[in-house]
Every structure is written in C-alpha cells, then in structure tokens.
Amino acid sequence: MRLAFGIVSLFPGGGLQRDCIEIARLVQAKGHEVTIYTCRLRDAGLADEIPVLVLQNDAKTNHQRQHTFALDFRRRTADRYDLIVGFDKLLELDVLYCADPSIAYRLKNRPYLYLLSRYRTFRKLERNSFARNGSVNIIFLSENQVIEYQSAWRTDFHRMSVIPPTLASDRKRPESRTDKIRKRVRTGLDLADDDWVWLSIGVQLRTKGIDRAVAALIEFPNARLLIAGLSDTNRASIKLAKHAQHLGVSSRITWLGHREDIHHLMAAADLLVHPARYDTTGTVILEGIVNGLPVITTAACGYARHVEAANAGSVLKEPFRFSLFVAALRRASDPSLRRAWSLSGAAYGADPTLYQGRVRAADLIVEAGFSKAARANIARSNTKESQACK
C-alpha cells in the first residue's frame, strides 16, 4: 500500500511528532510506502528514510495554518494514495491519530468562544472526522478522550480505538539513577547534594502547569526547579521568567531548553512535577515512573492513573487546589517515601504493555488500509455484476 501521513508541524522533541515518525517507520517495515506531508519542518533529517514533503503555507495564525494545510493536503493526496492518515484534525481522512482534546466538548460550556474564528475553524475540522455516521477510523491515546468526543459528537463506537501507552522502550533507563551518574549530572547542572530538585518538562508552560510549579517554589526554600523544553529567552517563556523574578524565585530555576537526555535529567531530579491543566496522556508522567522518578501530577492527565497503579507518587484531584498541591509537595519532601515510590515505579516499568502503543497504532492503520481495499473490491465487483445484468 501507499500511505500519506499528514501533520501540521514536524520538529524535534514533540511527542506527537515522535509518534508520527515512529509509526511511519513501523508501517514501512511491514512493506508499505509512507510519505509524510507537513507545512512546518524544523529538521530536514528528522525522519531519516521516510520521505517528507513540505507544503508551502503562509498563514499567520495556528488555526489558519491548520485549515490551509488541511485543504492543501487533501488536494495533493486525492486519488494518489491507498490510505490517508492525519496526525492533526484534517479533511477527508481515512484514519485520524488523535492526540488532542475535543474543541466541541469545551465549547459546550463556553459557547461565547464561537465568536472567535479560531474555535469555529477548529470545530469545523473536528466535525469532519467525528460527526456521527462518519467513516474515519479514530485512534485515541486515552480513555478520557473517548468520553469527551462521544459526549460532544456521539461518534460511532466502532470507529474508535484506544491504544496502550506510546512510550518508547529505549526511554526506560532506571539504571541511570545510580549514585555515580546522578552525582555527575547534578554537578554538571550546578546542583548541590542537599538541593531538593524538581523537574518539569514541556513547551506549553501554562497547559502543563509549569507556572504552578514556579509559584510553589515560594513554599520550599531548598527546592530547585529544572525546566526542560524551553530556554528563558524563548518567546513563550519570557512572561513566566519575569513572573519568577517578581516572586523572587528566579535564581532557583534552571531553564534547560530542548534536551534529548531526559533520562539523565530524571536521574538528577528528586521529583517530576507535572501539575497540568490538561494533558491528553502526559507521556512524561509514565517516563518518570519507569525511570524511578516519583511524580506529582493532576487527574487532568490521561496517564495519571499509572501513578496510582504503580504507587509512584501523588495525583491531585480536579478541580485543582493550590493548597493541596503544596501539601502533596510537602509530603514528597520525605526521602524515605520518595525512595519507596522510586522502587515501585521502576518495578512497574517491567510491564511490556507500557511500550506497545505505536506498534498497535501501526497495526490499526494497516488494518484500515486492507479493509478499505476490500470494500473497494466489493464495490467494483457489485458494479460489474450490475452492468452484466443489464
């Protein structure tokens, strides 16, 4: 089969981007041809042996960019491929790999947002895949998504599949928490032996709740916060960096920018602090667990259930209360409790199903291609029979 994958932005470090590339490789390894289409490519060598075609897109806003890309992708792929797969909400897809929350679900309680063109545009794209009696096969990353989309659109259950976690097995390196490696990494980050080190990871600072972690530093004078994903000079982080300065905690924050050595950062840290307002999955949560790093997170994250299942930290119930967040952090300041959480998390990481999500997604995509081909053959056969009877 020849398959086209569409994703608006392709850049290093993004979870959706890693999923797109790795699933493309898995499908290709099954003997099929895959071409990735995008309109924003930050690293030309990112996909290695997978062909990547960049469609010019001069839109100035995110919603205009996605809508323009959806139109261009549909035009460029029509009748040229056996299966069309979207990693963003696009148009006339065969399969959608959905990593986003439902716009329509959020608009139900905030109808005034319809006044904004961005929400109208995103809802229109969402409807194309999720409206009842549609034909798009949808791959979800968490059960939370099924509840949202079904509530908003009454999407047919037979079109929806939920895959296991998409954590790559090579991200599991609990052996990195040995004293030797831990000390070396902490020294390189200018961390003292008695510093209580929090790690937060993400590029969407407010969505991931990193502003909440910054605010909590006031309550813990011996805590240091490492923020991986953005530098303090990035446009998205300047506002929070200034706020940290206003709070008097900026000297205890280290902005690390984009990092590929996350397992080393997790070895150096004492706690993963991920008080997100929303996270479809929160793969970093699971990554922390299997690497023996205790986790403080919120129930708004799809993978928060793994924290409780592994007994590897604390999950804050919704709605979020800052006082309970501080209380959870205070409880996590106990080294013996963190040690127990660390051992439980590393043991939980031995479960092989935690690393099978991308394989399952590739299987579902290939199955969808074969099903589409079978339906087309039946339709052609019926047409020939009908013509023969005339």
Predicted regions and their residues:
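Aromatic "clamp/platform" in nucleotide-sugar-dependent glycosyltransferases that forms part
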Residues: 258, 277
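Nucleotide-activated donor-binding/catalytic signature segment of Leloir-type glycosyltransferases, i.e.
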Residues: 237-257
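Short hydrophobic beta-strand element within catalytic cores of glycosyltransferases
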Residues: 294-298
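Membrane-proximal helix-turn-helix segments that form the acceptor-binding/catalytic region
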Residues: 119-141, 146-147, 153
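A short hydrophobic beta-strand element within the catalytic core of glycosyltransferases
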Residues: 272-273, 284
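Glycosyltransferase donor-sugar binding loop
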Residues: 39-41, 167, 201, 224-239
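A conserved mid-protein helix/loop that constitutes part of the nucleotide-sugar donor-binding site
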Residues: 18-22, 196-219, 235-238
